[in-house]
A protein has these predicted regions:
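Classical N-terminal secretory signal peptides
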Residues: 1-2, 160
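Functional cleft and adjacent loop/helix regions within the main domain
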Residues: 44, 50, 159
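Unchanged
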Residues: 48-136
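Acidic, Ala/Val/Gly-enriched low-complexity intrinsically disordered segments
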Residues: 2-8
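Charged phosphate-binding loop/patch that engages nucleotide di/tri-phosphates or the phosphate backbone
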Residues: 130-160
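A generic structural signal for ordered secondary structure
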Residues: 18, 26-28, 55, 75, ...
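N-terminal strand-loop-strand
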Residues: 8-43
C-alpha cells in the first residue's frame, strides 16, 4: 500500500514564546494579514533562538513585533498546536508570559505582515483573537493580572 502524504511527512517539534502584554488593564494585540490568505488578531510571539531562555525570547519577540519594551511579570503556561507545511507536520509549543507595558505605544512590524496593533479591553481582546488556544491563554493571564492587582502587586516590579 502507498503511504498517504500525511504519513510520509516528518514530524518536527518547534518552540515559540510570547507575551500577554497589559497596560492599564488593556491587552496588546497584533493584526496579521499575509497576502490576504491569513488574517486575524493574535498575541505577539516568535521562535526561540539558539542559547536563548524562554523569557528572553518572549521579551525580544514582543519588542520586535510591536515595538513595546515590556517587563515579564510571570510565566502563564503553554499552548500547543499542529500545522502542515509542504513536507512536514510541525508540532509547535508556545510558552507564554504575563507582561506589563509602560505606555499604550505600539508599532506593528510590517516585515512580519502585521498591519495593525493596539490595546483592547479584555472582552474585546477575547473576541478579537483568532485562535481558541490564544483565547485560553489570555483568560489565564488576565485572571492572574486581576489577582496581582487585587494584592497590590501589579506595577511593583520589585516583587518579581
Amino acid at each position: 500500500p502507498e503511504l498517504s502524504a500525511q504519513e510520509d511527512r516528518a514530524m518536527i517539534k518547534a518552540t515559540s514564546c510570547g507575551g500577554v502584554v497589559i497596560f492599564r488593564g488593556k491587552i496588546l494585540l497584533l493584526y496579521k494579514n499575509y497576502k490576504n490568505r491569513y488574517d486575524g488578531w493574535v498575541l505577539p510571539k516568535g521562535t526561540v533562538e539558539a542559547g536563548e531562555e524562554y523569557k528572553e525570547t518572549a521579551l525580544r519577540e514582543v519588542h520586535e513585533e510591536t515595538g513595546v519594551k515590556a517587563s515579564a511579570i510571570k510565566y502563564v503556561g503553554k499552548s500547543q498546536y499542529t500545522f502542515n507545511t509542504a513536507h512536514d507536520v510541525v508540532v509547535k509549543q508556545v510558552h507564554w508570559y504575563l507582561m506589563m507595558a509602560d505606555s499604550y505605544y505600539s508599532k506593528p512590524q510590517k516585515e512580519e505582515y502585521f498591519e495593525d496593533s493596539g490595546y483592547y479591553k479584555y472582552h474585546e481582546a477575547y473576541h478579537l483573537l483568532r485562535f481558541p488556544n490564544e483565547r485560553q491563554i489570555l483568560e489565564d493571564a488576565y485572571q492572574q493580572y486581576i489577582e496581582l492587582k487585587k494584592a497590590g502587586l501589579w506595577g511593583n516590579k520589585k516583587y518579581f
